């Protein structure tokens, strides 16, 4: 049983592992699908875009104008460079949206950089928006996901104690010429599990008491 217990403990120690923290970062970007048709033929392309939001409130009516402008290679180049000498003018398209509410005329003008086949798409969405933004902005959001596996291990140890008492007896020969002694081991062998140490101590105490009694009789 002791060897089996040692094997169980060793197996538990080998199977236990440390918790590992892994971080996953997710980047979110906005992409638009551009469909260009010419001569009864249409071509579709996907490009990253920046979002421009204009919000107008007239007589309690909130109107949100969202414009997506596709990014071009020249825009990326200008954003990465910080020196003013690298900035060059870029051709752009002008998008004008005019609304009339209760006799009030409002015009919204948006400029988008001109690329080979890019066109600005405007989406009008009524709703309530907290703030107003009139310039194009690029938004990057990060999401951190942390996973911590939990490893649980349980170790059970079984304790076994064996106690054996030996009784010494002496007797006198009837002729009075000689005496002899003998050692008689008792056959009381007790096995304890867990914390049963008190029983072994009691049996050893009884053995010593028997020896003391025999010594008193002989004297």
UniProtKB/Swiss-Prot annotation:
- Lipid positions (GPI-anchor amidated glycine): 194
On induction, the UniProt comment says: Up-regulated by high iron, during biofilm development, and upon ALS2 depletion.
Report the PTM annotation: The GPI-anchor is attached to the protein in the endoplasmic reticulum and serves to target the protein to the cell surface. There, the glucosamine-inositol phospholipid moiety is cleaved off and the GPI-modified mannoprotein is covalently attached via its lipidless GPI glycan remnant to the 1,6-beta-glucan of the outer cell wall layer.
**Domain of life per record:** Eukaryota
Identify its membrane topology class.
Answer: Lipid-anchor; GPI-anchor
What glycosylation sites does the entry record?
A: 21, 173, 188
Task: Tell me the keywords, alphabetical order.
Answer: Cell wall, Glycoprotein, GPI-anchor, Lipoprotein, Membrane, Repeat, Secreted, Signal
GO CC terms for this protein? Answer: extracellular region; fungal-type cell wall; side of membrane
Give the location in the cell: Secreted, Cell wall; Membrane
Annotated signal sequence range? 1-19
Which residues would be cut away as propeptide?
195-219
The UniProt family comment states: Belongs to the flocculin family.
Its biological function?
Answer: Probable cell wall protein that participates directly in adhesive cell-cell interactions.
Q: What else is known?
A: The PGA6 mRNA is transported by SHE3 to the hyphal tips during filamentous growth.
Q: What is this protein called?
A: Predicted GPI-anchored protein 6
Q: Which organism is it from?
A: Candida albicans (strain SC5314 / ATCC MYA-2876) (Yeast)
Lineage of source species: Eukaryota, Fungi, Dikarya, Ascomycota, Saccharomycotina
